[in-house]
Swiss-Prot record:
Residues bound to ATP 1: 13, 117-123, 131-132
Record protein name field: Universal stress protein Rv2005c
Residue runs in coiled coils: none
Stored Gene3D superfamilies: HUPs
PANTHER family reported in the protein's UniProt record: STRESS RESPONSE PROTEIN NHAX (PTHR46268), UNIVERSAL STRESS PROTEIN RV2623 (PTHR46268:SF27)
Residues annotated for ATP 2 binding in this entry: 165, 198, 262-268, 276-278
Reported consequences of knocking out the gene: No visible phenotype under normal or hypoxic and normoxic stationary phase growth, nor in mouse- or human-derived macrophage cell lines.
Gene Ontology biological process terms from the UniProt entry: response to antibiotic; response to hypoxia
Sequence similarity: Belongs to the universal stress protein A family.
Length: 295
């Protein structure tokens, strides 16, 4: 029995930045591939704190609403253009007056995926992950895709593979599920990466490298076997290396169209924390990154 669809489909949070424009386009394409609705959301943050406190003019709220409507309208236009007239896509939009992070977390509980730009208009530098994106990848009730406006230029991007990091944790099993689904919908290869050392080999005296490598390769093959039976249309390549996971994933992402990681790995303490590998990949990869989460 297939699981029931969530009411919001793919949700894109927009704020008028270049990154959110890119997110609207990517989210629309993903929603069209899934044949589910796209919901464009802009949250007007009426609770703006200053020090010392200062009064805002009465027209402030009107200006915020007008700007919000323009942001939503532009994002909807970009989303429809990204999909094209020959593909069917149901697009809804919401303008919400509230606090951005709690609102988006609540919406995520009824979404198949949330898509956000890597940094918003308030970002100090494009190398930083925006505060809303950073919070959502820690707290959302569904997978979160983070999109850059300056994605790396990849030859023939539509045929580039999907990349997934696997470390044997339950969360990486969820990432594997998301990655197979995305690769199947795109009709591309899946590259499964297992980098099994968080330290340099020279720091591990007496290590039987060949034995560990062989065991790691066997473990990855076993992890993937069931998924390959479920998705026989997805060609799979396995990469098993003695390397730091984040470094290898970022390196391999240069030739991928999408990277999928778990929200935290074997060392993750709780669902509220973002693992060091996921955090590093989100900041360093220049292609879309999905952080696999669930409610």
């Amino acid at each position: 029995m297939s699981k029931p669809r969530k009411q919001h489909g793919v949700v894109v949070g927009v704020d008028g930045s270049l990154e959110s424009d890119a997110a609207a386009c990517w989210g629309a394409t993903d929603a069209a591939m899934r044949n589910i609705p796209l919901t464009v959301v802009h949250v007007v943050n009426a609770d703006v704190a200053t020090w010392p406190p200062m009064p805002y003019p009465e027209t402030w709220g009107v200006w915020q609403e007008d700007e919000g409507r323009q942001i939503v309208a532009n994002a909807v236009k970009l989303a429809k253009e990204a999909v094209g007239a020959d593909r069917k896509l149901s697009v809804k939009s919401e303008l919400v007056f509230s606090t951005p992070v709690p609102t988006m977390v609540e919406i995520s509980n009824e979404a198949e995926m949330v898509v956000l730009g890597s940094s918003g208009r308030g970002a100090l530098a494009r190398g930083l992950l925006g505060s809303v994106s950073s919070s959502l990848v820690r707290r959302a009730g569904c997978p979160v895709a983070v999109i850059h406006s300056d994605d790396a230029v990849i030859p023939d991007p539509q045929h580039a593979p999907v990349l997934v990091g696997i470390d044997g944790s339950p969360v990486s099993e969820l990432a594997t599920a998301v990655a197979f689904d995305e690769a199947s919908r795109r009709g591309v290869e899946l590259i499964a990466v297992h980098a099994w050392s968080d330290v340099e080999v020279v720091e591990l005296p007496g290590l039987d490298f060949s034995a560990v490598q062989q065991e790691a390769e066997l473990s990855l093959a076993e992890r993937l076997a069931g998924w390959q039976e479920r998705y026989p249309d997805v060609p799979v390549s396995r990469v098993v290396v003695c390397d730091r996971p984040a470094r290898k994933l970022v390196q391999k992402s240069a030739s991928a169209q999408l990277v999928v990681v778990g929200s935290h790995g074997r060392g993750g303490l709780t669902g509220m924390l973002l693992g060091s590998v996921s955090n590093a990949v989100l900041h360093a990869a220049r292609v879309p990154v999905i952080v696999a989460r669930q409610s």
